[in-house]
Structures are given as structure tokens and as C-alpha cells.
């Protein structure tokens, strides 16, 4: 098949179709949705929360070994939606980059710098025929010394933007519609409201009530800027508060 034929646009990452599309990049976005996971991120006035559905594909798996939340440094967290193997590779490289940044400059890598680095790396993967785009959307969260709580989303095409709230993966548009209503008047959510808004969005989109073991919740707070994953007991408290409120 010649490079100019329709199939050629599908096979070669670096060739634009006559309509100006890069099919392999579009397929990377489809791979993210094909993972069947929905992720939510919400930024409050003094905290950031990310939530994702925790699916254990095999009953014999140890569910503590299944995660989509990764600490990059003590203060930066990453929620990966999509292909887990691609995510782990990206996370390891991001950790190396953050450690090198700390060694070179003497302070922690800011959230926006990490997001830009991930986006730059993803964009390079769209230029070379011997690489393929990563099938991962990464949400990066942390507290910026100057700007406070920060939430960024990086996609396989190399875009990265700061968000008040966002979603990735399956049913992401439905989640964004839900979040737009919640964020309409630019509310200043407390820590509890931030976490519960994120969990409520996931429940609303997937139309099910979760057990604490079925979701993962990662948070960073201004008064304690370390990234951490909530325990099942802490998640249970928020689920109870949501059910009582509703």
C-alpha cells in the first residue's frame, strides 16, 4: 500500500490526512476511553482532589497492587487514565525528571513545569515514525507557592491546560457537563466540598453508588501540601456525608 493511500494515513504517525488529521493520535485518545475508566479532578480554594474508578479485572488479583494514582515527588501527584503500562513508564520518567530538577535548581519542581514536561514528551511522540503516542491522559496536581492549588491535564497530543475541574476517560464529556453546573458560579470549595464534589461527579456519571474499595481518591491540601491517597475509612466518611446530604 502506498504512503499516499488512505491506509497510509492510518499506519504512519507523522503523516497528515488530507483533512488535516493525525489518525494515530486520534486512536491514542480512543485507547484512553477503551480502558473503561472515568477520572475526575476538582480544584478547591485550598485543595485539589482527583478521583477514579478502581476496576480489578481479575478476582485473584491483589487489589492493593492495582492503582492509577502515583506520587511523582512528595508534593506532586499524578492520576493516569488509560493504558496502565504506558502510565507506569511515564511516571518513572517523570520521577527521574523531577529528581533531576530538584538536584539542579535546589527546590521542588512546580506543578506547571511537570505538566509542560509531560506534554512536551507526548508531543514528541507524535512527530516520529518509530514511536507511538502514549495511550494515557495524565492529571497532575500540587500546591504552587505563588498560585496555590493547581490542577493540570496532559493528553496524548501534547496539550496541557490548567483546570478548575476536569475529567478524562470513558464518559468524560458527561462528567464535564456535570462539573460545569457545579462550578458555574466559581465556588470556593472547602476541602470536604472539593472531595465530595469529585466523588459525586463520578457517581452521577456512572450512575452507581460506590463502596470505598471501588474508587481511588488522591488529594493535596494547602495546609499540608504533601500528595496522599485517602484510606478506605476516609473515603467511607465522604461517601456517608454524600448519601446523608442527598
From Swiss-Prot:
<protein>
    <recommendedName>
        <fullName>Proteasome subunit alpha type-6</fullName>
    </recommendedName>
</protein>
<comment type="similarity">
    <text>Belongs to the peptidase T1A family.</text>
</comment>
<keyword id="KW-0539">Nucleus</keyword>
<dbReference type="GO" id="GO:0043161">
    <property type="term" value="P:proteasome-mediated ubiquitin-dependent protein catabolic process"/>
</dbReference>
<dbReference type="InterPro" id="IPR034642">
    <property type="entry name" value="Proteasome_subunit_alpha6"/>
</dbReference>
<dbReference type="GO" id="GO:0005634">
    <property type="term" value="C:nucleus"/>
</dbReference>
<dbReference type="GO" id="GO:0005737">
    <property type="term" value="C:cytoplasm"/>
</dbReference>
<dbReference type="GO" id="GO:0019773">
    <property type="term" value="C:proteasome core complex, alpha-subunit complex"/>
</dbReference>
<keyword id="KW-0647">Proteasome</keyword>
<comment type="function">
    <text>The proteasome is a multicatalytic proteinase complex which is characterized by its ability to cleave peptides with Arg, Phe, Tyr, Leu, and Glu adjacent to the leaving group at neutral or slightly basic pH. The proteasome has an ATP-dependent proteolytic activity.</text>
</comment>
<comment type="subunit">
    <text>The 26S proteasome consists of a 20S proteasome core and two 19S regulatory subunits. The 20S proteasome core is composed of 28 subunits that are arranged in four stacked rings, resulting in a barrel-shaped structure. The two end rings are each formed by seven alpha subunits, and the two central rings are each formed by seven beta subunits. The catalytic chamber with the active sites is on the inside of the barrel.</text>
</comment>
<dbReference type="InterPro" id="IPR023332">
    <property type="entry name" value="Proteasome_alpha-type"/>
</dbReference>
<dbReference type="Pfam" id="PF10584">
    <property type="entry name" value="Proteasome_A_N"/>
</dbReference>
<dbReference type="InterPro" id="IPR029055">
    <property type="entry name" value="Ntn_hydrolases_N"/>
</dbReference>
<dbReference type="InterPro" id="IPR050115">
    <property type="entry name" value="Proteasome_alpha"/>
</dbReference>
<keyword id="KW-0963">Cytoplasm</keyword>
<dbReference type="InterPro" id="IPR000426">
    <property type="entry name" value="Proteasome_asu_N"/>
</dbReference>
<dbReference type="InterPro" id="IPR001353">
    <property type="entry name" value="Proteasome_sua/b"/>
</dbReference>
<dbReference type="Pfam" id="PF00227">
    <property type="entry name" value="Proteasome"/>
</dbReference>
Amino acid at each position: 500500500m502506498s504512503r499516499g493511500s488512505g491506509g497510509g494515513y492510518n499506519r504512519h504517525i507523522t503523516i497528515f490526512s488530507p483533512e488535516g488529521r493525525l489518525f494515530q493520535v486520534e486512536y491514542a485518545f480512543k485507547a484512553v476511553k477503551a480502558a473503561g475508566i472515568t477520572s475526575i479532578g476538582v480544584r478547591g480554594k485550598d485543595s485539589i482532589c482527583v478521583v477514579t474508578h478502581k476496576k480489578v479485572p481479575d478476582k485473584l488479583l491483589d487489589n492493593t497492587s492495582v492503582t492509577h494514582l502515583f506520587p511523582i515527588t512528595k508534593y506532586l501527584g499524578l492520576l493516569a487514565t488509560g493504558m496502565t503500562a504506558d502510565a507506569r513508564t511515564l511516571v518513572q520518567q517523570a520521577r527521574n525528571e523531577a529528581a533531576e530538577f530538584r538536584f539542579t535548581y535546589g527546590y521542588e519542581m512546580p506543578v506547571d513545569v511537570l505538566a509542560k514536561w509531560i506534554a512536551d514528551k507526548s508531543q514528541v511522540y507524535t512527530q516520529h515514525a518509530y514511536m507511538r503516542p502514549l495511550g494515557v491522559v495524565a492529571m497532575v496536581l500540587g500546591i504552587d507557592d505563588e498560585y496555590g492549588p493547581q490542577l493540570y491535564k496532559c493528553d496524548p497530543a501534547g496539550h496541557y491546560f490548567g483546570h478548575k475541574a476536569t475529567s478524562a476517560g470513558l464518559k468524560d464529556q458527561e462528567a464535564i457537563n456535570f462539573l460545569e453546573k457545579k462550578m458555574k458560579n466559581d465556588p470556593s470549595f472547602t476541602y470536604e466540598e472539593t472531595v465530595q464534589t469529585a466523588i459525586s461527579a463520578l457517581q452521577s456519571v456512572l450512575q452507581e453508588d460506590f463502596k470505598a474499595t471501588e474508587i481511588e481518591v488522591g488529594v493535596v491540601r494547602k495546609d499540608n501540601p504533601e500528595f496522599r491517597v485517602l484510606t478506605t475509612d476516609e473515603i467511607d466518611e465522604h461517601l456517608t456525608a454524600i448519601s446523608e446530604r442527598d
